[in-house]
């Protein structure tokens, strides 16, 4: 009996130690904040040494401004075929796989798109939510806005992306516009917007400051965007679309901006940015 009791004690001790080792050295494959968590940030002035903003392609930070596309260093004029992206490195838990819960989020930013007074200009910029490891696509200049590649741009199953596009040139997949009227669109896995509204970019003064507000309500699943040009005399414009983000996005995403020029050019500058998400 004494020998049997000793063996049982040894076995129990072995199981305890094994469990302790497993719990000590196992690490989660993704961030694990609890439900009810909130992530927020506010950038009133961009810093080129900020560890939280990752720029790629032609995007750069200078004098407190995030420039998404490239300009000539001598003349300051925008360059053709420029593509840039800036991403906030904080992972956003946009929905929870276990509970099925969706996050609410809101973001606002000020921007300047300078067309240099040209009637024809392009191509635009986006605010987007995409996978944690989302590289800058090849051949994504022009109407692909630094977000899509030509081969899969119209195939939603290939693009786990949701974006608000500020599109200044009408391409073949855009709403018909004989006058090349710029538009704001909601993109769900495709460059072909699910909902659009006219963007009064050509009817405000050069270098006018625009203000955008984007919100997602997890109960109604409505994604909404409003854009205004304070002091311009133009009414705010807005568009919304109902989308279940769980059907498009991975559980964890990053948020950011992208932009592109093609044969036509303009500048795309983000002046400030705030974001908040709550799950």
UniProtKB/Swiss-Prot annotation:
Coiled-coil annotated residue ranges, if any: none
Q: Keywords assigned by UniProt?
A: Glycoprotein, Lectin, Signal
Asked if the Swiss-Prot or TrEMBL record annotates the protein with the keyword Nucleotide-binding, the reply is no
* Protein name as it appears in the record: Lectin 9
Organism per entry: Medicago truncatula (Barrel medic)
Q: Per its record, what triggers expression of this gene product?
A: Accumulates in roots during colonization by arbuscular mycorrhizal (AM) fungi (e.g. Glomus intraradices).
Q: Can the keyword Calcium be found in this entry's annotation?
A: no
Which lineage?
A: Eukaryota, Viridiplantae, Streptophyta, Embryophyta, Tracheophyta
Glycan attachment sites: 116, 139, 235, 272
Please explain the role this protein plays, according to its UniProt record.
Answer: May be involved in arbuscular mycorrhizal (AM) symbiosis with AM fungi.
